[in-house]
Structures are given as C-alpha cells and as structure tokens.
C-alpha cells in the first residue's frame, strides 16, 4: 500500500508521500479555486448532469482543489428554484460532483467545497441572518455567534468545507455598494463581531474564511473593486 493511503501514518507523512508523486500541474490544480460551481451542472427536474466545462477543468488539472459556489443562487449566478440546487437535491448534486472528481483524479483526491455566507448561507433554502450592518447595531456578539452556529450546521449538512464570510471590512465610505457587509465604521466593534461570527461557524466543523483582506472597504469614490486607498 502506498504511504499516502495508509491511515496508520500521520497526515504529514501521508501528505509528504502524496506530494512527491504529484506533477506540478496536479499541485497547481489543488491550489486554485477559479471554477464557478453554479456553472458546472445542468438541472432537468430532479436530474443533475455535469457540464463539459467542469469535465475539462478536472482533466486539465487532474482534479479540483476547491469548488466555489455549487449551491449559490441569486441574480448574479442565474440560479433559482427552477434551475438551481435545492435542499432536496443538494446531497445528490454533491455526491455526483465529488464522485466524478475522485474517479478522475490519479490519486483519488476529493475536492473541498466553498460557499458564500455573507449573512447566512447564500443558497436556495439557506437560513439568513440580518445584514452585518444591522447586526453590528445590536452590539451583541454572543447572539451573532449562536446565529452562525445555526448557519454552520446547515453548511455542514451540504458537505461545505469553507464558509466565505464577509466579516473584516470596515465601513469608511457609505457610498460603497457593499456597505451592508460591514459591521461598523469602528474597528473594535467590528473585530468583536467578526471573532464571534468565526467562533460560531467553526464550532460546527466548517472552516471560516474571513474576508476581505485587506482594505476592500477603502474604495475610491465608493466604487466596488476600485483602487483601494491604503
């Protein structure tokens, strides 16, 4: 048995053996998150089929490192109740995608799944919290932590590994179109709320990706993704 398959060895020993066997392309594939998950499938009723775009990506990199937004549903993604992944279909969809990735990876490496969680899970049937700006006005970190425990359990039920959480931005310019993602203009209050949100999420076993680092809120003229004034 190859060392990377030997569960009696430490994770470090298994990873070392696996890395020594992988090509540069395969390693690169494990480090990127460029594919939009909401573009990798087509839904016909309750049937989920994988797109050629997804299959070509797996083939190019010998696997998928992180898949972003499989469950995302909003005007930007173009997914809704008619063509998106509902709670009812989430298990089948995840299993279909993960099975394909594992079977088409030379070493059977499973993908990680990342999902947007700006104020709750951004998905069909996702539980939502008030926007961050409203939550910041409560000055109640403990309550926020409990809210994210609920969100975390929902993400975990959908096999989500990474929750992308907008918790670090400081509101400097109210013209910015994403001001509601900030807890406050005050760094201390924002830090307390961010710590509470991350703590609540990670109690469920889902890893929190705290964003945006750094200075996304320091926009020029309030224009999103413009030059940042640091």
Where are these regions (language model features)?
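Glycoside hydrolase catalytic-domain context in secreted enzymes
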Residues: 1-230
């Amino acid at each position: 048995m190859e060392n990377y398959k030997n569960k009696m060895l430490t994770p470090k020993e298994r990873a070392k053996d696996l890395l020594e066997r992988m090509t540069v392309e395969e390693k690169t594939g494990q480090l990127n998150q460029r594919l939009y998950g909401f573009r990798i499938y087509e839904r016909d009723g309750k049937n989920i089929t994988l797109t050629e775009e997804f299959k070509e990506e797996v083939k190019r990199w010998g696997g998928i490192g992180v898949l972003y937004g499989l469950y995302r549903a909003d005007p930007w993604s173009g997914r809704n109740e008619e063509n998106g992944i509902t709670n009812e279909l989430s298990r089948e969809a995840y299993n279909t995608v993960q099975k394909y990735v594992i079977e088409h990876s030379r070493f059977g490496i499973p993908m990680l799944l990342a999902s947007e969680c700006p104020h709750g899970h951004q998905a069909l049937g996702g539980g939502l919290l008030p926007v961050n700006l409203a939550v910041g006005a409560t000055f109640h970190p403990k309550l926020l932590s409990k809210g994210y425990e609920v969100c975390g359990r929902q993400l975990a039920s959908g096999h989500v590994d990474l929750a992308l959480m907008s918790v670090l931005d400081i509101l400097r310019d109210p013209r910015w179109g994403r001001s509601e993602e900030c807890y406050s203009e005050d760094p201390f209050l924002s830090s307390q709320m961010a710590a509470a949100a991350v703590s609540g999420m990670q109690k469920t076993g889902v890893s929190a990706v705290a964003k945006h680092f750094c200075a996304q809120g320091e926009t020029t003229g309030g224009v999103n993704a413009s030059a940042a004034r640091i």
